[in-house]
Amino acid sequence: MRASRKGDALAQLLYNEGIRSQAVLNAIAGTPRESFLPDALKHKAYQNTALPIGQGQTISQPYIVAKMTELLLDSPNKPEKVLEIGTGSGYQTAILAQLFAKVFSVERIKTLQFQAKRRMNQLDLHNIAMKHGDGWKGWASKGPYDAIIVTAAAASLPQDLCDQLKEGGRLIIPVGNEQQSLLCIDRIEGELKTSTIESVRFVPLVAGELM
Protein backbone atom coordinates (compact mmCIF):
# COMPACT_ATOMS: atom_id res chain seq x y z
CA MET A 1 0.00 0.00 0.00
CA ARG A 2 1.17 3.49 -0.85
CA ALA A 3 1.84 6.02 1.90
CA SER A 4 -0.18 9.23 2.10
CA ARG A 5 1.01 12.57 3.47
CA LYS A 6 -1.16 12.05 6.54
CA GLY A 7 0.19 8.52 6.90
CA ASP A 8 3.76 9.77 6.67
CA ALA A 9 3.02 12.42 9.30
CA LEU A 10 1.59 9.78 11.64
CA ALA A 11 4.64 7.56 11.11
CA GLN A 12 6.91 10.51 11.95
CA LEU A 13 4.92 11.16 15.12
CA LEU A 14 5.32 7.51 16.14
CA TYR A 15 9.05 7.69 15.43
CA ASN A 16 9.21 10.68 17.74
CA GLU A 17 7.37 8.58 20.36
CA GLY A 18 10.08 5.90 20.21
CA ILE A 19 9.03 3.46 17.46
CA ARG A 20 12.20 2.50 15.60
CA SER A 21 11.24 -0.36 13.27
CA GLN A 22 11.19 1.08 9.75
CA ALA A 23 9.06 -1.86 8.59
CA VAL A 24 6.40 -1.00 11.17
CA LEU A 25 6.54 2.72 10.35
CA ASN A 26 6.17 1.96 6.63
CA ALA A 27 3.15 -0.25 7.29
CA ILE A 28 1.53 2.45 9.44
CA ALA A 29 2.23 5.13 6.81
CA GLY A 30 0.75 3.04 4.02
CA THR A 31 -2.40 1.80 5.76
CA PRO A 32 -5.46 4.07 5.31
CA ARG A 33 -6.72 4.21 8.92
CA GLU A 34 -9.85 6.06 7.82
CA SER A 35 -11.00 2.85 6.10
CA PHE A 36 -11.41 1.27 9.55
CA LEU A 37 -13.52 4.03 11.09
CA PRO A 38 -17.18 5.10 10.99
CA ASP A 39 -17.84 8.04 8.66
CA ALA A 40 -18.34 10.43 11.57
CA LEU A 41 -14.80 9.76 12.84
CA LYS A 42 -12.82 9.56 9.60
CA HIS A 43 -11.50 13.10 10.12
CA LYS A 44 -9.73 11.83 13.25
CA ALA A 45 -8.09 8.87 11.50
CA TYR A 46 -4.51 10.13 11.73
CA GLN A 47 -4.65 11.32 15.31
CA ASN A 48 -2.62 9.22 17.72
CA THR A 49 -5.63 8.18 19.75
CA ALA A 50 -7.99 5.24 20.24
CA LEU A 51 -11.46 5.76 18.74
CA PRO A 52 -14.83 3.98 19.12
CA ILE A 53 -15.94 1.63 16.34
CA GLY A 54 -19.27 0.47 17.79
CA GLN A 55 -20.30 -2.61 19.79
CA GLY A 56 -18.47 -1.11 22.78
CA GLN A 57 -15.12 -1.62 21.04
CA THR A 58 -12.33 0.69 19.90
CA ILE A 59 -9.65 0.95 17.24
CA SER A 60 -6.39 1.05 19.17
CA GLN A 61 -4.13 4.08 19.40
CA PRO A 62 -1.62 3.93 16.51
CA TYR A 63 1.29 4.11 18.96
CA ILE A 64 0.20 0.96 20.78
CA VAL A 65 -0.46 -0.85 17.48
CA ALA A 66 3.06 0.03 16.37
CA LYS A 67 4.61 -0.84 19.74
CA MET A 68 2.99 -4.27 19.95
CA THR A 69 3.88 -5.05 16.34
CA GLU A 70 7.47 -3.93 16.89
CA LEU A 71 7.73 -6.26 19.89
CA LEU A 72 6.61 -9.17 17.70
CA LEU A 73 9.13 -8.29 14.99
CA ASP A 74 11.88 -8.17 17.61
CA SER A 75 11.20 -11.77 18.64
CA PRO A 76 14.40 -13.86 18.31
CA ASN A 77 12.61 -16.61 16.34
CA LYS A 78 11.68 -14.29 13.41
CA PRO A 79 7.97 -15.18 13.46
CA GLU A 80 6.06 -15.96 10.28
CA LYS A 81 2.78 -17.41 11.61
CA VAL A 82 0.88 -15.02 13.91
CA LEU A 83 -2.37 -15.36 15.86
CA GLU A 84 -4.30 -12.18 16.65
CA ILE A 85 -6.96 -12.22 19.35
CA GLY A 86 -9.52 -9.45 18.84
CA THR A 87 -9.82 -8.51 15.17
CA GLY A 88 -11.96 -5.48 15.96
CA SER A 89 -11.89 -3.03 13.06
CA GLY A 90 -9.11 -5.00 11.37
CA TYR A 91 -6.55 -2.17 11.55
CA GLN A 92 -4.01 -4.13 13.59
CA THR A 93 -4.72 -7.16 11.37
CA ALA A 94 -3.86 -5.15 8.26
CA ILE A 95 -0.57 -3.99 9.79
CA LEU A 96 0.35 -7.56 10.72
CA ALA A 97 -0.54 -8.89 7.26
CA GLN A 98 2.06 -6.60 5.68
CA LEU A 99 4.84 -7.87 7.96
CA PHE A 100 4.21 -11.58 8.55
CA ALA A 101 3.65 -14.48 6.17
CA LYS A 102 0.33 -15.69 7.64
CA VAL A 103 -2.07 -14.07 10.09
CA PHE A 104 -4.89 -15.87 11.90
CA SER A 105 -7.39 -13.58 13.63
CA VAL A 106 -10.24 -14.35 16.05
CA GLU A 107 -13.12 -11.95 16.82
CA ARG A 108 -16.00 -12.70 19.20
CA ILE A 109 -18.41 -10.13 17.68
CA LYS A 110 -19.75 -11.41 14.36
CA THR A 111 -20.62 -7.97 12.97
CA LEU A 112 -17.07 -6.69 13.50
CA GLN A 113 -15.57 -9.85 12.05
CA PHE A 114 -17.68 -9.51 8.89
CA GLN A 115 -16.76 -5.84 8.45
CA ALA A 116 -13.06 -6.51 8.99
CA LYS A 117 -13.04 -9.34 6.45
CA ARG A 118 -14.59 -7.02 3.86
CA ARG A 119 -11.91 -4.39 4.54
CA MET A 120 -9.11 -6.93 4.08
CA ASN A 121 -10.50 -7.80 0.65
CA GLN A 122 -10.79 -4.12 -0.27
CA LEU A 123 -7.14 -3.59 0.70
CA ASP A 124 -6.09 -6.70 -1.26
CA LEU A 125 -4.69 -8.43 1.83
CA HIS A 126 -5.14 -12.16 1.35
CA ASN A 127 -2.69 -13.81 3.77
CA ILE A 128 -5.26 -13.60 6.58
CA ALA A 129 -7.62 -16.26 7.95
CA MET A 130 -10.46 -15.02 10.16
CA LYS A 131 -12.70 -16.79 12.62
CA HIS A 132 -15.74 -15.82 14.69
CA GLY A 133 -15.01 -17.30 18.10
CA ASP A 134 -13.97 -16.97 21.72
CA GLY A 135 -10.60 -15.24 21.93
CA TRP A 136 -9.83 -16.79 25.32
CA LYS A 137 -9.65 -20.16 23.55
CA GLY A 138 -7.46 -19.01 20.66
CA TRP A 139 -7.52 -21.09 17.48
CA ALA A 140 -5.95 -24.39 18.44
CA SER A 141 -6.62 -26.24 15.18
CA LYS A 142 -4.37 -23.81 13.26
CA GLY A 143 -1.62 -23.67 15.90
CA PRO A 144 0.93 -23.68 17.26
CA TYR A 145 2.02 -20.13 16.45
CA ASP A 146 5.34 -18.32 16.25
CA ALA A 147 3.71 -15.28 17.84
CA ILE A 148 0.40 -14.28 19.44
CA ILE A 149 -0.90 -10.73 19.88
CA VAL A 150 -3.93 -9.90 22.02
CA THR A 151 -5.74 -6.59 21.49
CA ALA A 152 -7.94 -6.64 24.60
CA ALA A 153 -7.00 -6.86 28.27
CA ALA A 154 -7.26 -10.26 29.95
CA ALA A 155 -7.96 -10.36 33.69
CA SER A 156 -5.39 -13.17 33.88
CA LEU A 157 -3.12 -14.94 31.43
CA PRO A 158 -5.23 -17.28 29.19
CA GLN A 159 -3.79 -20.79 29.47
CA ASP A 160 -5.13 -21.83 26.05
CA LEU A 161 -3.13 -19.07 24.37
CA CYS A 162 0.04 -20.06 26.21
CA ASP A 163 -0.49 -23.66 25.10
CA GLN A 164 -0.74 -22.54 21.44
CA LEU A 165 2.61 -20.72 21.52
CA LYS A 166 5.55 -22.51 19.89
CA GLU A 167 8.86 -23.06 21.61
CA GLY A 168 10.76 -19.84 20.99
CA GLY A 169 7.48 -18.01 20.40
CA ARG A 170 6.39 -14.65 21.76
CA LEU A 171 3.04 -13.54 23.23
CA ILE A 172 2.17 -9.85 23.53
CA ILE A 173 -0.84 -9.28 25.80
CA PRO A 174 -2.31 -6.58 28.06
CA VAL A 175 -3.24 -8.03 31.45
CA GLY A 176 -5.23 -6.51 34.30
CA ASN A 177 -8.56 -4.94 35.17
CA GLU A 178 -8.39 -1.32 36.35
CA GLN A 179 -4.58 -1.33 36.27
CA GLN A 180 -3.32 -2.93 33.06
CA SER A 181 0.21 -3.79 31.95
CA LEU A 182 1.44 -4.77 28.50
CA LEU A 183 3.37 -8.04 28.87
CA CYS A 184 5.91 -9.60 26.54
CA ILE A 185 6.08 -13.35 27.16
CA ASP A 186 8.64 -15.67 25.54
CA ARG A 187 8.50 -19.46 25.63
CA ILE A 188 12.08 -20.54 26.33
CA GLU A 189 12.89 -24.22 26.96
CA GLY A 190 9.27 -24.86 27.89
CA GLU A 191 9.11 -22.01 30.40
CA LEU A 192 7.29 -18.68 30.04
CA LYS A 193 9.57 -15.69 30.62
CA THR A 194 7.62 -12.47 31.23
CA SER A 195 8.68 -8.85 30.81
CA THR A 196 6.48 -5.86 31.63
CA ILE A 197 6.63 -3.23 28.88
CA GLU A 198 4.41 -0.36 30.01
CA SER A 199 1.04 0.60 31.47
CA VAL A 200 -1.85 0.50 28.97
CA ARG A 201 -5.61 0.88 28.72
CA PHE A 202 -7.60 -1.65 26.63
CA VAL A 203 -11.19 -2.83 26.48
CA PRO A 204 -11.58 -6.15 28.37
CA LEU A 205 -11.04 -9.54 26.74
CA VAL A 206 -14.50 -11.06 27.11
CA ALA A 207 -15.13 -14.80 26.92
CA GLY A 208 -17.75 -16.29 24.60
CA GLU A 209 -19.15 -15.26 21.22
CA LEU A 210 -21.63 -12.57 20.15
CA MET A 211 -23.61 -12.66 16.93
Curated annotation (Swiss-Prot):
**Gene3D superfamilies annotated for this entry?**
Vaccinia Virus protein VP39
Keywords, alphabetical: Cytoplasm, Methyltransferase, S-adenosyl-L-methionine, Transferase
Q: Which residues participate directly in catalysis?
A: S60
> What is the main EC category here?
transferase
Which PROSITE patterns does this one have? Answer: PCMT
Give GO terms for biological process. methylation; protein modification process; protein repair
The job of this chain, per UniProt, is described as: Catalyzes the methyl esterification of L-isoaspartyl residues in peptides and proteins that result from spontaneous decomposition of normal L-aspartyl and L-asparaginyl residues. It plays a role in the repair and/or degradation of damaged proteins.
The UniProt GO MF terms for this protein read: protein-L-isoaspartate (D-aspartate) O-methyltransferase activity
Q: Per UniProt, what is the name of the gene that codes for the protein in this document?
A: pcm
The subcellular location is: Cytoplasm
Q: Which family does it belong to?
A: Belongs to the methyltransferase superfamily. L-isoaspartyl/D-aspartyl protein methyltransferase family.
Q: What Gene Ontology terms describe where this protein resides (cellular component)?
A: cytoplasm
Major localization class: cytoplasm
Give the protein's recorded name.
Protein-L-isoaspartate O-methyltransferase
Q: Which domain of life is it from?
A: Bacteria
NCBIfam families from the UniProt entry: pimt, PRK00312.1
List its EC numbers.
2.1.1.77
Which reaction equation describes what this protein catalyses? Answer: [protein]-L-isoaspartate + S-adenosyl-L-methionine = [protein]-L-isoaspartate alpha-methyl ester + S-adenosyl-L-homocysteine
User: Species name for this entry?
Assistant: Alteromonas mediterranea (strain DSM 17117 / CIP 110805 / LMG 28347 / Deep ecotype)
Q: Which Pfam families match?
A: PCMT (PF01135)
Which InterPro entries does the protein's record reference? PCMT (IPR000682), SAM-dependent_MTases_sf (IPR029063)
